[in-house]
Swiss-Prot record:
Protein name: Peptidyl-tRNA hydrolase
Alphabetized UniProt keyword annotations: Cytoplasm, Hydrolase, RNA-binding, tRNA-binding
Source organism (scientific name): Rhodococcus jostii (strain RHA1)
Annotated Gene Ontology cellular component terms: cytoplasm
Molecular function GO terms recorded: peptidyl-tRNA hydrolase activity; tRNA binding
Gene3D superfamilies, alphabetized: Peptidyl-tRNA hydrolase (3.40.50.1470)
Broad EC category: hydrolase
Keyword tRNA-binding (UniProt): yes
Length: 190
């Protein structure tokens, strides 16, 4: 990626009742990145997000968590992109991914949203799907459980034992893509 400002967005739902749910893994990874940046999230009134402003290896970086529910997060992401003049190619969205086994991390640019309404909202608000994604696997729901219910449930006790490591590795993946770009990061991770 270039030296232009990077916008890194962790997706999740606001409120303590969602804090430990699968859908909030993007917020969890953003928390790890915030600690690494040495910053604390604060409200950015013009966008409807909480942000940390800092530098990653000298590059201006905005770390964000939209304060709206995930399905409406596009407004905050587009607002931040406009306010900080960030091109969609310099946006990295961290989100939960049903189609990957728990703990699997994949990087991707553009493409479909795979039924993820948070991504759909962002694509619509930005007017493009051409932004980077850090996909954090949460696995498929068991049996016939509705995926919409599954993503709003807490991680299992077995998953919770590995969750901190998954969030650390996901943060590593975000930092890698910021450092070396998508293709080189994919070659190292995949």
């Amino acid at each position: 990626m270039s030296e232009d400002t990077a916008l890194v967005v962790g997706l999740g739902n606001p409120g303590p009742q969602y804090e430990k749910t699968r859908h909030n893994v993007g917020f969890m990874v953003a928390g790890v990145l915030s600690a690494r940046m040495g910053g604390k999230f604060s409200a950015h009134k013009k966008s409807g997000a909480e942000i940390v402003q800092g530098r990653f290896e000298g590059r201006p970086t905005i770390l964000a968590k939209p304060r709206s529910f995930m399905n409406l997060s596009g407004s905050a992401v587009a607002g931040l992109a406009r306010f900080f003049s960030v091109d969609p190619g310099n946006i990295v969205v961290i989100h939960d991914e049903l189609d990957l086994d728990f703990g699997t991390i994949r990087l991707k640019q553009g493409g479909g949203e795979g039924g993820h309404n948070g991504l759909r909202s962002i694509s619509s608000a930005l007017g493009t799907k051409d932004y980077l994604r850090t996909r954090v696997g949460i696995g498929r729901p068991p049996g016939r459980m509705d995926p919409a219910s599954y993503v709003l449930k807490p991680f299992s006790s077995v998953e919770r034992k590995e969750l901190d490591l998954v969030c650390e590795e996901s943060a590593d993946a975000v930092e890698l893509v910021l450092r070396v770009g998508l293709e080189a990061a994919q070659n190292r991770l995949h």
